[in-house]
Amino acid sequence: MENTARAILRYAHLSPYKARQVINLIRGKDIATALAILSQIPKKSARIVEKVLKSAIANAEFKGMDIDNLYISKIHAEEGPMLKRYTPKAHGRATMIRRRFSHIYVYLAEKQQEDK
């Protein structure tokens, strides 16, 4: 198996849909480009994904990988548990409010050097 580093953030108070909007912009990019893209996005989800990406970079550095040669091989957000709350409505009814959580996974790998 190739040399990879990963970071996982569980129970992020962020819906998976909003996390995926940011994640889709950086999938497959090298880490310098991904950090530049994330720093320009004015969303809470961008700050959270940026923090997980920096953690994955630190893990790669600890494993002795070349930081300048890393790219995001896999990144995805899955749905975590949901807190269900109820709010009263007219005529004795109530509606459910779902407070969503997500798990964010980031995998980094080194680019393969092509021999000519």
From Swiss-Prot:
Highest rank taxon of the organism: Bacteria
Record note on quaternary structure: Part of the 50S ribosomal subunit.
InterPro entries noted in UniProt: Ribosomal_uL22, Ribosomal_uL22_bac/chlpt-type, Ribosomal_uL22_bac/org-type, Ribosomal_uL22_sf
Key words of the record: Ribonucleoprotein, Ribosomal protein, RNA-binding, rRNA-binding
Family of this protein: Belongs to the universal ribosomal protein uL22 family.
Annotated GO MF terms: rRNA binding; structural constituent of ribosome
Protein's UniProt keywords contain Hydrolase: no
Pfam families named among the record's database cross-references: Ribosomal_L22
A GO term from the CC aspect: cytosolic large ribosomal subunit
Gene3D superfamilies found in the cross-reference section: Ribosomal protein L22/L17
GO biological process, one term: translation
Protein name: Large ribosomal subunit protein uL22
Job of this protein: This protein binds specifically to 23S rRNA; its binding is stimulated by other ribosomal proteins, e.g. L4, L17, and L20. It is important during the early stages of 50S assembly. It makes multiple contacts with different domains of the 23S rRNA in the assembled 50S subunit and ribosome.
The organism of origin for this protein: Sulfurihydrogenibium sp. (strain YO3AOP1)
Coiled-coil region list: none
